[in-house]
From Swiss-Prot:
InterPro entries: Ribosomal_uL13, Ribosomal_uL13_bac-type, Ribosomal_uL13_sf
PANTHER family: LARGE RIBOSOMAL SUBUNIT PROTEIN UL13M, RIBOSOMAL PROTEIN L13
Gene it is expressed from: rplM
A Gene Ontology cellular-component term: cytosolic large ribosomal subunit
Family: Belongs to the universal ribosomal protein uL13 family.
Species this protein is from: Macrococcus caseolyticus (strain JCSC5402) (Macrococcoides caseolyticum)
Identification of the protein by name: Large ribosomal subunit protein uL13
């Protein structure tokens, strides 16, 4: 009788992928990256195990925001002091800190809790085209669609 394969931390082969975000739509790119970080592209995917790969996302400053999201999409944060709410539009955040824009988008698509935190640590976002991970010999990843 065959048994269903269950991955665990010891038998997971992790790869490194480079994805160029230039001209890509933010939401579509984020969902694809979240899927890679989770390991859903592998036949050995196990929901309760971190079996994803490392993703290096370059050119985050050249991401495309469709529609009016650059002006209409608002990100909020609070300092926990009275009247301490701050807001910034997606377009302003892309100009000021494109890395945080992509990290926020991708983190929202990962599982909540400690497993999602482990998956998120395998994401490496850079505003420009350069990254310091050449020693890991990353492969270029072609997005679907």
């Amino acid at each position: 009788m065959r048994q269903t394969f269950m991955a665990n931390e010891s038998n997971i082969d992790r790869k490194w992928y480079v994805i160029d975000a230039e001209g890509k739509t933010m939401g579509r790119l984020s969902s694809e990256v979240a899927s890679i970080l989770r390991g859903k592209h592998k036949p050995t995917f196990t929901p309760h195990v971190d079996c994803g790969d490392h993703v290096i996302l370059i050119n985050a400053e050249k991401i495309y925001l469709s529609g009016n999201k650059a002006e209409d999409k608002i990100y909020y944060r609070h300092s926990n002091h009275p009247g301490g709410i701050k807001s910034i539009s997606a377009g302003e955040l892309r100009e000021k800190n494109p890395v945080r824009l992509m990290e926020t988008s991708i983190k929202g698509m990962l599982p909540k809790g400690s497993l999602g935190d482990k998956m998120f640590k395998k994401l490496h976002v850079y505003a420009g085209a350069e990254h310091p991970h050449t020693a890991q010999q990353p492969e270029n990843y072609e997005l679907r669609g």
